[in-house]
């Protein structure tokens, strides 16, 4: 089993490549996250077009549709009430409506993810490996910052908290809580049997590294 298909330039490979960048974009920041989401949505719409919406819809999907529809209607209604307020002094703006409409992109993102999972386009092993690599990187960078009072990028440490590659943003612990779970499941799911001693040993070591980093990060 290879990480990608034999042909490098394929639709599935490009889609998976953007998914592999997810843990990295969270380290870089919001601009990278939003850009990656935009490219992911745009590319999948171009590649798969209407097929994205030809999935088996379940009860949970309907609940999610209702939720997003409620958010949209609520945003439009609030904006209408604001515009109809004759006693309003400050200038009108469409920020609330804009945010409501932009929020709908997450519904589209959900449908796309449902599609690529249902059609087995996503390469879970590659995604788990990517999450594991960046989780270990963040953990080791926190250790480095803890020992030398600055990380490998030169970000200084704090007396009580260490952010690693996140600089002034104290979110390293939250990052590890989200992405290190893939590290713990990598060997049991994709490389070694869950009862294998080597698998248990490697998983335990990675767990201790992540846990220690979370504690150090504050």
Pin down the residues of each PLM region.
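Alpha-helical transmembrane segments of multi-pass inner-membrane proteins
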Residues: 20-22, 108-110, 125-157, 167-218
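Alpha-helical hydrophobic/aromatic positions enriched in membrane-embedded helices and signal peptides
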Residues: 66, 72, 97, 130-133, ...
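Short aromatic-rich membrane-water interface segments that cap or initiate transmembrane helices
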Residues: 89-101, 159-173
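Transmembrane signal-anchor hairpin modules in multi-pass inner-membrane enzymes, especially those
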Residues: 1-89, 94, 115-125, 129, ...
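Membrane-interface helix termini and inter-helical loops of multi-pass transporters
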Residues: 82-91, 150-161
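Short conserved micro-motifs on helix faces and helix-strand junctions that flank
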Residues: 26, 71, 165, 216-217
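Membrane-embedded alpha-helical segments of multi-pass membrane proteins
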Residues: 30-50, 97-111, 172-184
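Short, flexible active-site loop motifs that bind/organize anionic cofactors or intermediates
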Residues: 117, 162, 177
């Amino acid at each position: 089993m290879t990480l990608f298909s034999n042909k490098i330039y394929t639709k599935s490979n490009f889609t998976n490549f953007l998914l592999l960048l997810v843990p990295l974009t969270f380290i870089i920041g919001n601009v990278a996250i939003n850009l990656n989401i935009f490219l992911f949505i745009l590319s999948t719409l171009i590649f798969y077009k209407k097929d994205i919406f030809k999935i088996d819809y379940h009860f949970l999907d309907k609940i999610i549709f209702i939720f997003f529809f409620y958010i949209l209607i609520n945003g439009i209604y609030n904006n209408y009430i604001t515009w109809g307020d004759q006693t309003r002094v400050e200038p009108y703006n469409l920020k609330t409506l804009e945010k409501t409409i932009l929020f709908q992109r997450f519904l589209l993102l959900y449908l796309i993810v449902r599609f690529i999972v249902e059609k087995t386009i996503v390469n879970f092993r590659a995604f788990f490996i990517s999450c594991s690599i960046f989780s270990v990187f963040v953990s080791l960078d926190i250790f480095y910052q803890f020992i030398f009072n600055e990380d490998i990028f030169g970000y200084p440490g704090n007396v009580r908290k260490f952010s690693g590659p996140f600089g002034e943003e104290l979110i390293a612990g939250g990052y590890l809580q989200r992405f290190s779970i893939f590290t713990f499941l990598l060997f049991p799911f994709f490389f070694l049997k869950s009862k294998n001693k080597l698998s248990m040993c490697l998983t335990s070591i990675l767990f201790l590294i992540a846990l220690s980093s979370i504690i150090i990060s504050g």
